[in-house]
Each structure stands twice: as C-alpha cells, then as structure tokens.
Design a protein with these regions (language model features):
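Conserved AdoMet/S-adenosylmethionine-binding subsite of the radical SAM
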Residues: 147-293
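A short small-residue
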Residues: 85-91, 137-140, 239-244, 282-284
Length: 330
C-alpha cells in the first residue's frame, strides 16, 4: 500500500469495544448495523501501517473517529509492566530509536491520507461508519511510556507545527500516559506545548491503594509519585483519567478498592485538580497475563455510577468485546 507523497509545507496538536455514558447513546451506536461493524476495527490496534515505523492510524473507540498514533517507544521499553497490557514484552524486539525526520515525514503523509479520505478506500478502513470518518486526534502512545522519550518536548512542538501546516487545528493532540514522568522539566515543557495546541492529557489511574497499584502496574515507581504528578498536571489544566478494571484470577476489584479509587479522585480535586472525564473501561484485547479477564458491561456501568455519585465527575463506560456474557462481577 502506498501513501501519498509528502506535500509542500506552508507557513502556518493505550482496548476496543463501544462506549456508553450514563446510559445515553453515542454516535458509534447511532447507526445500528454500522455500529456493529465498528467492533472488529476497534479490536485491532496495529502499530504499523504500510511501511511506516512510527505513525499509524486506528479507529479509536474513545475518540469517536480516526486517531493517528505516534509510537515513541518502538523498542517496547516501558517503565510499567502492566498485567493487562497488550504489548508482548517477552519477545526480543528490534532496538530502534526514533528517527525524527522519518516520524515527521510519516505524520505529514498520514495527515494528508486521512484528511483527503483516501484511508477509507483501504481494506482496513473501508467499513468505517460514516459518523466516524473523521480525524479526531494525534495520539502519543504506542508500545511504551511516551514521556520517557528524551526529546519529548521537541517532538510535541514539531508535531504541533505539522498539524498547523495541514490546517488541522480542530484535531486534538492527545498524550496517553502513566503520569510517572510528569515531574521532569522537559516533559512539563511538552505538556505546555500540548496546552497551546488543542492538547489533552489522558493519565492512567487504576488503583486506590498502593497494594493494588503494585499488583496491576508492576513497577518500582511509587504510587505516591504518580498521584502527585497527576495532581500537579490537573491543577494546571483539566485532564482525562483512564481507569481500566479487570478480573484477576477470576476476581473483580473489591468494593474497598473501588472506594479507595474514588477517594484518590476526590483528594486530587480537593488539592485543586480538575477532571474533564473519567474513562472507565476493561480488557478488550489479549492481555499480558492469562489470569486477566474483562469485567462485565454491568460491572463497568456500576463503576461509572460510583464515580459519578461519590465524586461528582463525568464518567464514561467502554466495554470489553463479548463481555455481556460474563457474570459474577460486582
């Protein structure tokens, strides 16, 4: 498959299933049969496309459209080792560093490819429902933690410039992060570039206690560091929280753990933090560990309701594929 040639520049940014929020319909469900066709597309988030090494398109359930992923960790290095992660870190991966010029060229070409509609003529995206045939964002995520990239601020600024050159100011720039590195100066500069270019931070928070955090994330980074970083970031701008809950060895998170999760959200708000949305979701692709399974749609809905009632924060549900058949979750 060939991508369009790079255009002259003018002088002028981490699961599948269908979303629901408070029982209300969303665009992905509004088209009946079309909403059913979207499921296979949502479940395959390949991080390669054509001959690209760093930039890849996905149909994102949380974005309600096409998201252009920017993979800053092609070597699969991550400072978390989450039990539910879809990235296979057991295989020896090729050591590849980010080639800035190659990334710039790929993003430039992919923006043209999506905005022209050519992407929807490919076999991978030809079944995309009409309502989702739109570029929603450029997302910095990929096979590891993007903020560990040493030139993080530079890459954010450069991608913002490319987005502006394509007059794609309506497209967001989304950082999907575990928030572990937000305290570093060059990362804070990158977050400020996001603020100036229709940016949004989606930070992971999936535990209420240190014990559960260590069980799920498997990292030496202290839970308190993550909480402090999220609090500081949320004081500076409203952020989105991503919270994935699952069954571990057949057991969903306890009521006590979920209550502690709500307490952490309330503590962040009490310290001046602002939330746009809490995304509550579950496992939708093959996890790292076989003892990890999705919770049911009902269980996801109950967590959404708990967040709304206990915290007064908007929350949205994203379900696992086939999870309606699950039972026994609280």
């Amino acid at each position: 498959m060939s991508l369009p040639p790079r255009q002259p520049q003018s002088a002028e940014p981490a699961s599948a299933g269908l979303p629901n929020s408070g029982g209300e319909s969303l665009p992905a469900r509004a088209e009946g049969e079309a909403s059913l066709r979207v499921v296979p597309l949502h479940t395959h988030h390949e991080r390669t496309f054509a001959e690209n090494r760093f930039v890849y398109p996905v149909l994102s359930r949380r974005s309600h459209g096409i998201s252009l992923g920017v993979n800053l960790n092609p070597d699969k290095v991550c400072n978390f080792d989450c039990i539910y992660c879809q990235v296979d870190r057991t295989r020896q991966s090729e050591t590849r560093f980010v080639d800035m010029q190659a990334l710039v060229d790929e993003l430039d070409s992919m923006l043209s490819f999506v905005r022209s509609g050519q992407i929807f003529k490919t076999s991978e995206f030809q079944e995309t429902p009409t309502a989702l045939r739109r570029l929603n964002d450029i997302a910095f995520s990929g096979d590891g933690e993007p903020t560990t990239y040493r030139n993080f601020d530079e890459i954010i600024a450069t991608c913002a410039d490319i987005k502006a050159q394509h007059h794609a100011n309506d497209a967001k720039m989304v950082l999907i992060s575990n928030a572990s590195m937000f305290h570093r100066p060059h990362v804070q500069r990158g977050l400020e570039y996001l603020d100036r270019n229709n940016g949004e931070i989606w930070a992971k928070l999936e535990a209420g206690t240190e014990e559960y955090y260590k069980l799920v994330e498997r990292t030496p980074i202290p839970f308190r560091q993550v909480l402090d970083n999220i609090t500081d970031a949320a004081r500076r701008r409203p952020i989105v929280i991503q919270a994935l809950f699952m069954r571990i060895h057949g057991k969903p998170p306890s009521e006590q753990e979920l209550a502690a999760f709500a307490d952490r959200l309330n503590e962040i708000r009490a310290a001046g933090g602002q939330f746009k949305l809490i995304q509550v979701y579950t496992v939708a692709r093959q996890p790292a560990e076989s003892f990890v399974e999705a919770i049911s749609d009902c269980a996801v809905d109950e967590i959404v309701e708990m967040v709304q009632v206990r915290c007064g924060i908007p929350a949205q549900a994203f379900y696992g594929v086939g999870s309606d058949d699950l039972s026994g979750d609280v």
